[in-house]
Design a protein with these regions (language model features):
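Extreme N-terminal tail/first-helix region
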Residues: 1-17
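Charged, gly/pro-rich active-site loop segments
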Residues: 1-5, 77-136
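Residues at secondary-structure transition points
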Residues: 4-8, 51, 55, 113
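Short beta-strand segments
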Residues: 17-52, 66-70, 81
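A short beta-turn/loop motif at secondary-structure boundaries
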Residues: 28-30, 72-76, 114
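Non-catalytic surface loops within mature trypsin-like serine protease
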Residues: 42, 52, 72, 88, ...
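Short, surface-exposed beta-strand-loop junctions and turns on beta-sheet-rich folds
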Residues: 54-56, 75, 136
Length: 136
């Protein structure tokens, strides 16, 4: 699998608010997947944001490996999967990061303001694409 930096066409696909699925590792070792929002930061890391009470935050603290598959909304056959590791977990005290994600995906700030949120930054170790994102 290729390693970063991402080619321009792959970076462009990941920059869109595409549907995505995040994979974590349950404490008993089995994979757990969930739909999620994400943003690619200027430094190439992936920003995720979680409700602080969610089990996947515990999964990430115990096993910092993450996979994320972003599916091109216009053609689900075209997708990019990244595998990486959590390099930072921080409280999203003022809900700045979840608002950024919510605006990216829906155009408005995140409506739920009374629950603690946590931001997770993932550094990409390697990636692969399929469909129009496939690299030979």
């Amino acid at each position: 699998m290729p390693k970063p930096p991402l080619p321009a066409d792959v970076a462009a696909l990941l920059a869109k608010p595409n549907p995505a699925v995040m994979g974590t590792i349950h404490p008993d070792g089995h994979p757990v997947t969930v739909a999620t929002w994400y943003l690619v930061e200027d430094d190439g890391r992936i920003l995720l944001n979680l409700d602080a009470s969610r089990a996947r935050l515990k999964h990430l603290r115990a096993h910092p490996q993450v996979s994320l598959t972003a599916i091109d909304e216009a053609n689900w056959y075209t997708h990019v999967s990244v595998q990486g590791r959590v390099v930072e977990i921080r409280d999203d005290t003022d809900l700045v990061d979840i608002d950024r994600l919510s605006v990216h995906y829906g155009g408005n700030p995140y409506p739920v303001r009374d629950r603690a949120r946590v931001s997770v930054l993932v550094e990409i170790d390697h990636w692969h694409g399929w469909g129009a994102a496939k690299q030979d």
